[in-house]
Amino acid sequence: MPHGAEREASPAEESAGTRPLTGEEYLESLRDAREVYLDGSRVKDVTAHPAFHNPARMTARLYDSLHDPAQKAVLTAPTDAGDGFTHRFFTAPRSVDDLVKDQAAIASWARKSYGWMGRSPDYKASFLGTLGANADFYEPFADNARRWYRESQEKVLYWNHAFLHPPVDRSLPADEVGDVFIHVERETDAGLVVSGAKVVATGSALTHAAFISHWGLPIKDRKFALVATVPMDADGLKVICRPSYSANAATTGSPFDNPLSSRLDENDAILVLDQVLIPWENVFVYGNLGKVHLLAGQSGMIERATFHGCTRLAVKLEFIAGLLAKALDITGAKDFRGVQTRLGEVLAWRNLFWSLSDAAARNPVPWKNGTLLPNPQAGMAYRWFMQIGYPRVLEIVQQDVASGLMYVNSSTEDFRNPETGPYLEKYLRGSDGAGAVERVKVMKLLWDAVGSDFGGRHELYERNYSGNHENTRIELLLSQTASGKLDSYMDFAQACMDEYDLDGWTAPDLESFHAMRSASRDLLGGL
């Protein structure tokens, strides 16, 4: 278990079984020796720094909800590796009902961030929740898989992942960029000494551990064949963050001016491993060139991650649809027919992603040891549709709200200034008696969602996090080719073609009307 996530159970807790961390325990677990760097300095305490304080509290809300009697029925289930309770998605589903309840738990947590936390703790449960049923895949490290399945359930541990190699030269295989890509430098009795870098470690500063793996083109050198987890406070692990939207909001704005970015920034980072010792008990795959390439296809992680992502995006689109409707209302544009058609389109995208999430839950495929996976075809359809659907929704917002997104004052202080406040109340008011503050509040929230640095980052995320725009299409083709479905579609088309030829219908119950056509030709030939 990551050092920072340890806690002692009281006698009452021990008799009652294990339980997830509370929000305060989660925050305390982050106060360790992790090396997080931002703006040229090491962050001493991520729970107190303006870049991470509010995002950490938004995550703490999730942990606290697991202990709320009013929410436990939706969010939690008994652990299947012990005698406590956990977030439902950390367990392996064995029925359609389990998956439908998993969907509800994912959606419930997503609503607490209005759909804007793509990497909440349950996201990596897409992997952790497979480790019990699929432990044998990780031989000779199967016991590690079973232990992490149990421990992640018991505490609802928060993992990030970093699979991608730094794109220093995408034309070269990993073996030829060995000084950059994660690789094992040496083996010791205590574990593997590892160096290199991984991207993009979204939200990693506020997690308990990093999950690293080779991902991409085949490799030839076993030192790159590594799948493992690293505690965030491991010696030699460094987190180098991108600019913080939360810190910028705290410095130059306010919650009113930056209502999303000031509390929901999942900071993306570079993970640097400099001679990091990874204990053997934290290794899942090492040195097996074949197995490391099978991880995506045989771990069950992709099917579960797309199920989680599709459900979260459906929630997010409900938020955007509601906010867009408020913006159209407050600008007096809601009754224009063209505007109504495009709001209807946004609702159609919302319905599409909920339908794909429902299809994934209600049409699962059998998997290992009596467990089920969400339907992979629904998941692959989601991965493609999100790449065109989310940008289209943003385009509609920009098209129909238009300059209203920029027709705002710079700061809340403008309303308090007696020289500008009265003018703003007069010239920035909304329709149907809405005051200027109400109108600007809507527009600033919408701008943060679609036009700010935070909003732009989210568009990039939704477009790319589940695969590049070509792979999502190719993988659909390869999947349906391998399963024989594409052949069956071709056979279906051929069945139609087999019912006719140059001489007419070959089906005995259909009439080709040869005599009628012959008479018609004779008639036309006489003209």
Swiss-Prot record:
<dbReference type="InterPro" id="IPR046373">
    <property type="entry name" value="Acyl-CoA_Oxase/DH_mid-dom_sf"/>
</dbReference>
<dbReference type="InterPro" id="IPR024719">
    <property type="entry name" value="HpaB/PvcC/4-BUDH_C"/>
</dbReference>
<dbReference type="Pfam" id="PF03241">
    <property type="entry name" value="HpaB"/>
</dbReference>
<dbReference type="Pfam" id="PF11794">
    <property type="entry name" value="HpaB_N"/>
</dbReference>
<feature type="binding site">
    <location>
        <begin position="167"/>
        <end position="170"/>
    </location>
    <ligand>
        <name>FAD</name>
    </ligand>
</feature>
<protein>
    <recommendedName>
        <fullName>(3S)-3-amino-3-(3-chloro-4-hydroxyphenyl)propanoyl-[peptidyl-carrier protein SgcC2] monooxygenase</fullName>
        <ecNumber>1.14.14.15</ecNumber>
    </recommendedName>
</protein>
<dbReference type="GO" id="GO:0004497">
    <property type="term" value="F:monooxygenase activity"/>
</dbReference>
<comment type="function">
    <text>Can also efficiently catalyze the regioselective hydroxylation of other 3-substituted beta-tyrosyl-S-SgcC2 analogs, including the bromo-, iodo-, fluoro-, and methyl-substituted analogs, but does not accept 3-hydroxy-beta-tyrosyl-S-SgcC2 as a substrate. Is only active with SgcC2 (peptidyl carrier protein)-tethered substrates.</text>
</comment>
<comment type="similarity">
    <text>Belongs to the FADH(2)-utilizing monooxygenase family.</text>
</comment>
<dbReference type="GO" id="GO:0017000">
    <property type="term" value="P:antibiotic biosynthetic process"/>
</dbReference>
<keyword id="KW-0285">Flavoprotein</keyword>
<dbReference type="GO" id="GO:0016627">
    <property type="term" value="F:oxidoreductase activity, acting on the CH-CH group of donors"/>
</dbReference>
<dbReference type="InterPro" id="IPR009100">
    <property type="entry name" value="AcylCoA_DH/oxidase_NM_dom_sf"/>
</dbReference>
<comment type="pathway">
    <text>Antibiotic biosynthesis.</text>
</comment>
<keyword id="KW-0274">FAD</keyword>
<keyword id="KW-0045">Antibiotic biosynthesis</keyword>
<dbReference type="InterPro" id="IPR036250">
    <property type="entry name" value="AcylCo_DH-like_C"/>
</dbReference>
<keyword id="KW-0560">Oxidoreductase</keyword>
<dbReference type="InterPro" id="IPR024674">
    <property type="entry name" value="HpaB/PvcC/4-BUDH_N"/>
</dbReference>
<dbReference type="InterPro" id="IPR024677">
    <property type="entry name" value="HpaB/PvcC"/>
</dbReference>
<feature type="binding site">
    <location>
        <position position="202"/>
    </location>
    <ligand>
        <name>FAD</name>
    </ligand>
</feature>
<comment type="subunit">
    <text>Homotetramer.</text>
</comment>
<feature type="region of interest" description="Disordered">
    <location>
        <begin position="1"/>
        <end position="22"/>
    </location>
</feature>
<keyword id="KW-0503">Monooxygenase</keyword>
<feature type="binding site">
    <location>
        <begin position="161"/>
        <end position="163"/>
    </location>
    <ligand>
        <name>FAD</name>
    </ligand>
</feature>
<feature type="compositionally biased region" description="Basic and acidic residues">
    <location>
        <begin position="1"/>
        <end position="10"/>
    </location>
</feature>
<dbReference type="InterPro" id="IPR004925">
    <property type="entry name" value="HpaB/PvcC/4-BUDH"/>
</dbReference>
